[in-house]
Amino acid sequence: MLKLFGLEEIDMFELEKLVRKNVLKLKPYSSARDEFQGSASVYLDANENPYPASQYNRYPDPHQVKLKQRISGIKSIPSDQIFLGNGSDEPIDLLIRAFCEPGVDSVLIPQPTYGMYTVSAEINNIAIKTVKLTPDFDLDVTAILHAVDVNTKLIFLCSPNNPSGNLLSFEKVKQVISGFTGLVIVDEAYIDFTDYAGFLPLLNQYPNLVVLQTLSKAWGLAAIRLGMCFASFEVIGILNKIKPPYNISLLSQQAAEAGLQKIQQKNEWVKEIIAERKRMEKELTQIKSVSKVYPSDANFLLVKISEARSVYHQLVSRSIIVRDRSNVILCDDCLRLTIGTPTENHTLLKELKAL
């Protein structure tokens, strides 16, 4: 039993009590490729066309063994604690489907944050509890732990947060993980743009911790849709139980393996993006219509600007696409600006100054 922050005592995390009963009883779909390990000389199990159209007539490895081994080496996380999804949106959806009973359970989502947590919960008919972030976009731990109840199964946290760009307080995130009996999902899509190690080193310390990362941002592989989910092997086993049998295509696996060999290139890109982020922050503050540029640990800046909606449409008319966040809580009159190449950033600054 735990007693934290003056709240009532709560039971320790127990995974089996958290998983939906039908999922616990579920016999997962199993292909012959699941049951057979290694390479065979004859494949007559999956009703494939035996005549190769290039190399794509066979189904891909359903377990992505080689790719997980490469990720394991980079992230220092065992392969059996890695789940790969079709973007991070797939594990987000699977976590909700595995642990939340439609019409009964709830998730908690501090706002503002990445919108797909809410969309996935709504698609699955899961109630959503919301707690506002503080004015500087950090966690209100007391409010979060007071808002959850016995039916709250998941808490989604994004750090660095989208759309604000800031890292959440490390200590506050740990307080939420320690004070909650369900799963806490920490989405670290933008973690490569910080000097911070993130929460991967704490996976074995907190059995209810799940960490999401992606190849879409710093690695420059958004088109292949490859999201990484790190958790205890028990949680990963549940996700593998309910995932589609061949959820990562061969093309995506090959592209990811090739991309992950270019660590030095990725690091150079990150260095350049951070340098441009600092330059953009400085130059944006000199534009009269800009009243605030929020501190960022990501590859974008949240900017408070006069008549943001109008500015957005004027930029669109000039073939410059940014993200209008002015209708999002705590983001009145804000645009989110991705850090582009120096040329792209120069074009954006030039047009903003001309408006």
Describe the role of every protein-language-model region:
Residues 122, 139-150, 163-184, 188-221:
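Active-site pre-lysine segment of PLP-dependent enzymes
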Residues 6-11, 317-318, 327-355:
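PLP-dependent enzyme catalytic core of the Aspartate aminotransferase-like
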Residues 274, 286-318:
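Conserved PLP-binding catalytic core of the aspartate aminotransferase-like
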Residues 208-286, 293:
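PLP-dependent aminotransferase class I/II
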Residues 68-106, 124:
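Phosphate-binding glycine-rich loop
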Residues 101-157:
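PLP-dependent aminotransferase-like
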Residues 78-82, 103-106, 151, 188, ...:
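Short acidic capping loops at alpha-helix termini that bridge into adjacent secondary structure
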Residues 4-74:
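N-terminal "arm"/small-domain region of PLP-dependent enzymes with the aminotransferase-like
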